[in-house]
Amino acid sequence: MPVEPAEGEHPMLELRNLSVGADNEGVHRDILKNVNLRVDDGRLLVLTGPNGGGKSTLAKTIAGILRPDTGRILLDGEDITERGITERARMGIGFAFQQPVRFKGLTVRDVLTLAAGGQVSEDKLYDYLRDVGLCARDYVDREIGSSLSGGEIKRIEIATVIARGARLTIFDE
């Protein structure tokens, strides 16, 4: 049985009657309809379902990539429904895409430093890579490009999410 927050406390994330749809050839189709969800701080939530079930749409809507048709998104009790992806990222919402972006010309060190928001010690860079199962010595100065496998790129993307220090991280797998 879920524990409700005490009076005056809010769940970290709350969705209230969230609906998202898409227009296709003049026909509106509901993808998500009246979704209600509460996620308390420090919890892990995994959503599973069939292809086309709306998982990516939900993830992108929470992150601010998509806008809901109706409903509200609250972070720590504050309505963030109208805020964009950049502002939500500043508020601590991180997002990892299904297909990680390849940053041609940048090294792993570069993207981790950017994600962390400034200079990062060598030890911290190594920690981020070790946390995702990569040998830091072998990867920290490698260029992110076609020489890395999809799995390596995904691990590096997860390391950037860790470096970002996001409060709420959404992985669209």
Regions found by a protein language model. Give the residues of each.
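Helix-to-loop junction immediately C-terminal to a conserved catalytic motif
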Residues: 63
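Hydrophobic anchor residue at the start of the ABC signature
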Residues: 158
